[in-house]
Amino acid sequence: MKNQSNLPLYQLFVHPKDLRELKKDIWDDDPVPAVMKVNQKRLDIDIAYRGSHIRDFKKKSYHISFYQPKTFRGAREIHLNAEYKDPSLMRNKLSLDFFSELGTLSPKAEFAFVKMNGKNEGVYLELESVDEYYLAKRKLADGAIFYAVDDDANFSLMSDLERETKTSLELGYEKKTGTEEDDFYLQDMIFKINTVPKAQFKSEVTKHVDVDKYLRWLAGIVFTSNYDGFVHNYALYRSGETGLFEVIPWDYDATWGRDIHGERMAADYVRIQGFNTLTARILDESEFRKSYKRLLEKTLQSLFTIEYMEPKIMAMYERIRPFVLMDPYKKNDIERFDREPDVICEYIKNRSQYLKDHLSIL
């Protein structure tokens, strides 16, 4: 079949007893043992379901940890995302690649075709785990990584979930790697960015946050319209070298004109200034606001254009289409899949116009 060798094949083998255990409680994070074969290489792994609301979907997403050998291609674990609610299957990868081009740290995302016990499971997006191996691959300084796990990761002293003052400044975060001292640095950063008076904010924030990287991340959210991106769907990395925090995007399927349910989303849904306490305070400083505006203007003329994005979208679409036809959960929806490149391009056109029309308010 044409393009047959164009996606890597991941064959998963799970003992029926373990598969039954896995399916018994989809909310259980405990993994079961399994085997993964890639290019004749046999890997002993632990496998579990991943995600929150996505666990309810027919096509499951998986978290895979390598057991024997302990690492594979320089990683200790990977995520296999079903991208079930995205009719294009491409939005997450498009977004993460876009962030990377904007100059933001971003996980690598590559398509693979997955089989389980000989049965086609379909097209998946393999997502690199953001951990110490991620840092090592990029020759980045050792440091702490915190995952933003819910809406309390809002850079505020107030809880989004409880609508009252947070009982702990670490609420909303889960430490992936780092020390107890790093917990203090996270709390210190959140406390300072919320309590420092305006007159001292500019000099104080630059002691805690890489503002240039933060503005690039903010621009990435605003271009892709990830409504959830301001308060979760990210990881924080504190460089042991600079002592500064930067933000790494995560889970960007609800973007490029569709929401988390896969429904069409208006191009003006996410405002140009973004959201969250830190964003508001940073953009309140004229120097930072001007930098952000210049970044948007430059990107609107380069990366975020139909001329630049359409060839990428079409190459991705053509690469995975033969495999979508073999995906048991997606093959009957192929007509919708075929319309998606146009939907994404229409979003770029409309979003670009919205942003150009609103640059003047920055």
Swiss-Prot record:
Q: Which domain of life is it from?
A: Bacteria
Q: Which Pfam families match?
A: CotH
| Keyword field | Sporulation
Q: Does the keyword Chloroplast apply?
A: no
Family indicated by similarity = Belongs to the CotH family.
| Role, per record | Involved in the assembly of several proteins in the inner and outer layer of the spore coat. Stabilizes CotC and CotU in the mother cell compartment of sporulating cells and promotes the assembly of both early and late forms of CotC-related polypeptides on the spore surface.
Identification of the protein by name = Inner spore coat protein H
Name its species: Bacillus subtilis (strain 168)
Q: What does the record give as the organism's lineage?
A: Bacteria, Bacillati, Bacillota, Bacilli, Bacillales
